[in-house]
Every structure is written in structure tokens, then in C-alpha cells.
Amino acid sequence: SLFELGKMILQETGKNPAKSYGAYYCYCGWGGQGQPKDATDRCCYVHKCCYKKLTGCNPKKDRYSYSWKDKTIVCGENNSCLKELCECDKAVAICLRENLNTYNKKYRYYLKPLCKKADAC
């Protein structure tokens, strides 16, 4: 769910997930279209594509369990869809941390209509 995703992003990046990524560039937050604009935006693009591959669960609402061991996210679900959902969220949180150097505050509230149509998963 969005709750676990936000928690993972905070743990990995140290940033407030809603404030920092809730409307960042073209793909972070709701919606998404066009070419990802930087490495941070590409993390969110890949995450949206990961969600599109899931069947049998609701990425925004369904809760899953994970643990934080030695600064590492460990997904712990028996249900395959919830496990995959956790892995999608884990991947984006790690990607955002690895690309903190590309994060630019000026794109925090980017107008999505400025993102040109294209790039589908």
C-alpha cells in the first residue's frame, strides 16, 4: 500500500515521501506520461511499470509486511502478488536512494501536462 511504500522511501532516502516525491517531475506521484526527465523520475517510471505487471492485488491499497534488517528491506509475504508488490516498492525506494544526486527540488511540483505523451511500459 501507499503506507508501506512511503515508509520504505523514508527509510532508504531520509526524505519525506509525500513532499519530496508526491509530485516530482513526470512519473513520481499520481499519473505519468512522456519521457522520464532524470534518473529520479526514471525510478518512478520503472515503478509504475512494475505495478502494471501485478495481477490479483491493488498496489495502492493492499497491505503487505516487510522488515528492516541491517538497513535492508526484506519482503516477507506468502501471497505471490503481495510479495511482488513489496519487491516493486523495495526496488523504487533503493533506486531513489541510489539517485539522490539527481534529485532537484525545482522539479518537486512539476506540472504533469508539460510531460509529453509517449513512453509506455
UniProtKB/Swiss-Prot annotation:
GO biological process entries: arachidonate secretion; lipid catabolic process; negative regulation of muscle contraction; negative regulation of T cell proliferation; phospholipid metabolic process; venom-mediated edema in another organism; venom-mediated muscle damage in another organism; venom-mediated myocyte killing in another organism
What Gene Ontology cellular component terms go with this record?
extracellular region
Q: Where is this region: Important for membrane-damaging activities in eukaryotes and bacteria?
A: 105-117
State one molecular function term (GO): toxin activity
Q: Which SMART domains does the entry mention?
A: PA2c
Keywords carried by this UniProt record: Disulfide bond, Myotoxin, Neurotoxin, Presynaptic neurotoxin, Secreted, Toxin
Q: Where is this site: Hydrophobic membrane-disruption site (MDiS)?
A: L111, L114
Tissues expressing the protein: Expressed by the venom gland.
Where found?
Answer: Secreted
Q: Does the keyword Disulfide bond apply?
A: yes
Xref: Pfam families: Phospholip_A2_1
Residue numbers for the site described as Important residue of the cationic membrane-docking site (MDoS)?
K105, R108
- The record's disulfide annotation reads C26-C115, C28-C44, C43-C95, C49-C121, C50-C88, C57-C81, C75-C86
| Main localization of the protein described in the UniProt heading | secreted
Annotated site (Cationic membrane-docking site (MDoS)): K112, K117
Q: Does the UniProt entry include the keyword Secreted?
A: yes
Q: Which family does it belong to?
A: Belongs to the phospholipase A2 family. Group II subfamily. K49 sub-subfamily.
Q: What does this protein do?
A: Snake venom phospholipase A2 homolog that lacks enzymatic activity. Is myotoxic and displays edema-inducing activities. In vitro, produced time-dependent, irreversible neuromuscular blockade in isolated mouse phrenic nerve-diaphragm and chick biventer cervicis preparations. A model of myotoxic mechanism has been proposed: an apo Lys49-PLA2 is activated by the entrance of a hydrophobic molecule (e.g. fatty acid) at the hydrophobic channel of the protein leading to a reorientation of a monomer.
Supply the name of the protein: Basic phospholipase A2 homolog BaTX
